């Protein structure tokens, strides 16, 4: 923690005279990687000591996380990384809250599956079927995370090699889930 604080005071003391117009601060060190909790206090410290916009980053996975980061750090903007994996609507949900004060509901099962299928289709158009189907396996796993019986479906999709088979598996999974509701 001391290294972080020393680094922040160095940044703050220079007041970024080198022409930087904004700075993004992640509340976690490289050594921490994804472990532990992001230290939003460091973002707040930088914000309090510089005159340029500060972009906060780290541990924003839900609308509530974004609200808490803004309130705790007073940062000017938020950058989202892993929180958008399998969750691209997080940006719309945060923007909606910022404009209305209302938190939109989580996307439905159908929205998640249809978004995964659209993402897969775009990936195939961009990279070709062979590469896209393989690269999309991890993305589809993120879309399905937390859904009923998703571990089985993820395992099955990880063995599929064609676009059409992945789409069929996603559609049959969605129908199975809707039948159980």
Model-derived features: positions:
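Single conserved hydrophobic/aromatic residue that forms the stacking wall/gate
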Residues: 1-11
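Alpha/beta catalytic cores of nucleotide-metabolism and tRNA/nucleoside-modifying enzymes
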Residues: 9-22, 34, 41, 45-56, ...
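Glycine-rich, proline-tolerant flexible connector loops at the mouths of alpha/beta enzymes
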Residues: 25-35
